[in-house]
């Protein structure tokens, strides 16, 4: 349905991620044109959801990487007891743990994206795994990175809260980790669909 079609109403919605718009679409008598064969929508919808889940996983990967980078830079600039806080062992460990948690996720996102065009029989399950795993790993990194900035991490001054909110938003769009894992289990025949 073209967006300017008569009978289509678009209402902007507020959401936690102010860097991304969100809208509700209402259809009242709008003329729809089938994009595929009648009854063949399930496959097109599945592929669209899979692509969206992989894109959200990749977006989370980039957001978490940026939060780690900003935390490391902050640790070298912020001083406590006349030395950078990044020189303290506990802070070093926190940064190293964030990087170690994120690094294996790169391969998972790459493989899930690769499956979308090259290994279609694995595409849906891998999209689910990437979305669920990145949602959880990146939420943990977002929490640590925000705390690593102290009270400043919760303000507009440092900018990490934008990434924190984006990761939280991405976590729920197209299914939270629990729902996406349930979808993966159903796709693999482990539970009833």
Language-model features: where?
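A glycine-biased, small/acidic residue-tolerant capping/turn segment at secondary-structure junctions
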Residues: 114-116, 122, 138-164
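C-terminal helix-coil-helix/basic helical segment that borders enzyme active sites and/or dimer interfaces
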Residues: 72-83, 99-133, 146-149, 185-193
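Buried hydrophobic positions in well-ordered alpha/beta secondary-structure cores of metabolic enzymes
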Residues: 25-27, 64, 95, 105, ...
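FAD-binding core of flavoproteins
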Residues: 1-69, 73, 83, 178, ...
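Glycine-rich phosphate/cofactor-binding loops in nucleotide/flavin-utilizing enzymes
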Residues: 151-193
């Amino acid at each position: 349905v073209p967006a300017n079609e008569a009978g289509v109403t678009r209402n902007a919605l507020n959401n936690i991620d102010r860097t991304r718009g969100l809208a509700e679409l209402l259809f009242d008598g709008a003329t729809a044109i089938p994009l595929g064969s009648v009854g063949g929508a399930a496959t097109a919808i599945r592929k669209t959801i899979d692509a969206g889940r992989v894109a959200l996983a990749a977006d989370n990967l980039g957001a978490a990487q940026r939060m780690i980078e900003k935390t490391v830079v902050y640790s070298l600039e912020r001083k406590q007891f006349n030395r950078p806080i990044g020189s303290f062992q506990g802070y070093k460990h926190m940064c190293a743990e964030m990087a170690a948690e994120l690094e294996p996720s790169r391969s998972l996102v790459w493989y899930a994206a690769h499956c979308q065009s090259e290994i279609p029989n694995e595409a849906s399950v891998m999209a689910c795994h990437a979305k669920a795993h990145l949602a959880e790993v990146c939420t943990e990194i977002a929490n640590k990175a925000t705390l690593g900035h102290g009270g400043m991490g919760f303000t507009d001054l440092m900018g990490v809260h934008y990434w924190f909110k984006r990761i939280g938003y991405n976590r729920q769009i197209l299914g939270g980790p629990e729902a996406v894992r349930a979808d993966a289990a159903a796709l693999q025949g482990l539970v009833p669909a």
